[in-house]
């Protein structure tokens, strides 16, 4: 269905908006005319109590709280200013830029999730388009929603596969976003990659072992996708 609106609010079926979410979003739109995409705090409801070892995974699962200071930036790189699609207000200009990209290559649609494939870089590609049209991304702490994640998303087996998919997604995002590659060259040489794994084990030694394994899975996801040479390949 076509829309003439300048803004669209994305709400997933597991999102519960606070009662003032839309009102505060409209205030942001009026107060910051150059913003292109923005979102806020995505919080777990009190009824969901995952084990503590899952906490380092929260940013990857769209559970985020960067504090009470507003953050805004025009950037073609990821940062706390870039909202996930869940609960995001997105300007028409940004969506038109995404449409332009999809018209140039339908391979972009393979960047999203599909049965048996935990890829998840569609959101980032949309948000990175803001800088292409001269608009910013913003973290707006006045916006709050509860993210009712399914319990199976906190399972170790799922999180390892999810992090592996995140690694693959990073390579695909570079390929489709017109950005300079962000994947370092040491992924391409086996001996350097082995050194990277050892470095990961050392730097993450104080983190839960489940998270360390997840980070290593992320590294292998990057390595795998680079070896495929075709960013859209399974």
Label the predicted regions.
Residues 161-165, 178-234:
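Non-catalytic, C-terminal membrane-associated alpha-helical segments of glycosyltransferases
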């Amino acid at each position: 269905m076509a829309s003439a609106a300048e803004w669209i609010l994305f709400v997933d079926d597991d999102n519960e908006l606070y009662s003032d979410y839309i009102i505060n979003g409209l205030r942001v739109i009026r107060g910051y005319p150059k913003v292109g995409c923005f979102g806020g705090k995505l919080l777990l409801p009190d009824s969901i109590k995952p084990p503590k070892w899952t906490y380092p995974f929260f940013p990857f699962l769209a559970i985020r709280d960067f504090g009470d200071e507003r953050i805004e930036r025009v950037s073609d790189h990821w940062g706390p200013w870039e909202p996930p699609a869940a609960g995001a207000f997105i300007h028409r200009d940004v969506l038109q830029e995404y449409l332009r990209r999809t018209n140039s290559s339908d391979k972009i649609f393979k960047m999203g999730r599909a049965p048996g494939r935990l890829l998840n870089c569609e959101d980032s590609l949309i948000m990175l388009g803001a800088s292409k049209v001269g608009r910013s991304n913003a973290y707006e702490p006045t916006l709050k929603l509860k993210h009712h994640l399914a319990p199976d998303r906190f399972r170790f087996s799922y999180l390892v596969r999810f992090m592996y998919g995140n690694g693959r997604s990073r390579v695909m995002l570079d390929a489709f976003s017109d950005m300079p590659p962000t994947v370092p060259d040491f992924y391409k040489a086996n001996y350097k990659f082995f050194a990277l794994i050892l470095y990961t084990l050392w730097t993450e030694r104080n983190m839960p072992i489940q998270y360390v394994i997840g980070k290593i899975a992320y590294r292998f996801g990057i390595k795998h996708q680079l070896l495929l040479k075709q960013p859209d390949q399974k």
